[in-house]
Regions:
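A short, structured loop/turn motif at beta-sheet edges
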Residues: 17, 64-69, 90-98
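Hydrophobic pocket/interface hotspot
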Residues: 19-21, 30, 45, 63, ...
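Glycine-rich portal/gate segments that line the openings of hydrophobic small-molecule binding cavities
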Residues: 31-78
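Generic structural detector for well-ordered beta-strands
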Residues: 9-13, 62, 89
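Short, charged helix-to-loop "capping" segments that act as catalytic/coupling loops
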Residues: 8-19, 42, 52-56, 95-97
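Short, surface-exposed coil-to-beta transition loops
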Residues: 5-7, 56-60, 82-87
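Hydrophobic ligand-binding cavity/cleft-lining segments
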Residues: 1-39
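Beta-strand/loop substructures that line and gate deep hydrophobic ligand-binding cavities in soluble
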Residues: 75-128, 132
């Protein structure tokens, strides 16, 4: 199935690469803003939304690449589109020195707005949990 590439850039209220790197590349960091529970095992992240004692849903993403202090690239294990991936990367403005979180993801045709809304909710949780 053909998917559309989505790019989102989110300015962050920090100049600390280390803080952002922890939030995008570790289970503990991702758990603060993407899912209720995240664990890393065997080169994969398992993302769970919902509580263990109630209804919950888990998805597993293989870690394709990590460039320390720069980016992490993931691919959902159930992904049918060969070119689809998720990439979270850190960029720095040459002018302001401000850090930006860049997100690349892929949406099914007609589902682009829903995917953007999902990421906007995640980014709002990132802001509330970390102040960024």
């Amino acid at each position: 199935m053909k998917k559309t590439k989505i790019n989102i850039e989110y300015p962050l209220n920090t100049k600390s690469n280390k803080l952002i790197w922890t939030l995008i590349s570790t289970a503990e960091g991702l758990q603060k803003w993407i899912a209720d529970y995240v664990k890393e095992e065997d080169g994969r992240f398992v993302f769970t939304r919902g509580e263990a004692w109630t209804e919950n849903h888990s998805l597993t993403a293989k870690i394709l690449h990590r460039e320390p202090m720069r980016s992490v690239k993931l691919r959902w294990e159930n992904e049918e589109c060969d070119e689809a991936y998720i990439e979270l990367s850190i960029a720095k403005s040459d002018i302001t020195g401000q850090q930006t979180l860049s997100i690349t993801d892929y949406a099914e045709e007609g589902d682009e707005d829903n995917l953007r809304d999902l990421w906007e909710g995640d980014l709002e949780r990132l802001h509330h949990s970390s102040g960024l």
